[in-house]
Amino acid sequence: MSKTRAVIPGSFDPITYGHLDIIERSADRFDEIHVCVLKNSSKGGTFDSEERMTLIEESVKHLPNIQVHHFNGLLVDFCDQVGAKTIIRGLRAVSDFEYELRLTSMNKKLNSNIETMYMMTSANYSFISSSIVKEVAAYQADISPFVPPHVERALKKKFNV
């Protein structure tokens, strides 16, 4: 029987407990999870791709079936490259769905063999976004409930806090 593989894409700038919630729950459902750091042309980055990958790798080291990559191209091409037929997308709120539906429709047009699976973020993480975490960190407030300790340290270093 062939391995089941899925891709979890995102900018992960930085990874949060909300991201980890989706990754950990997905790791129980697939043989391999490929976390893919994508460059979002509409977002400026705080961390470069290598830094993001390092933060993710540290965050998922307890999960043996996770591989972390970065990719500068179409997500469906990355899926083909790693042999994944499923894209996993986390939803925090209903407001995320409209954007995600457009992405899913485009991916389906580009590669009809790829399916997208949506997972609702656990309620206690549904308000967390990387952007909000960075904003709070810049004001030197406590971000420990939102990100792993090593991510908190990296953000403090970035913001000279």
From Swiss-Prot:
ATP binds at residues 11-12, 19, 90-92, 100, 125-131. Keywords: ATP-binding, Coenzyme A biosynthesis, Cytoplasm, Magnesium, Nucleotide-binding, Nucleotidyltransferase, Transferase. GO terms for molecular function: ATP binding; pantetheine-phosphate adenylyltransferase activity. Its cofactor is Mg(2+). InterPro entries: Cyt_trans-like, PPAT, Rossmann-like_a/b/a_fold. Pfam families: CTP_transf_like (PF01467). Belongs to the bacterial CoaD family. Reversibly transfers an adenylyl group from ATP to 4'-phosphopantetheine, yielding dephospho-CoA (dPCoA) and pyrophosphate. NCBIfam families: coaD_prev_kdtB, cyt_tran_rel. This is Phosphopantetheine adenylyltransferase. It comes from Staphylococcus epidermidis (strain ATCC 35984 / DSM 28319 / BCRC 17069 / CCUG 31568 / BM 3577 / RP62A).
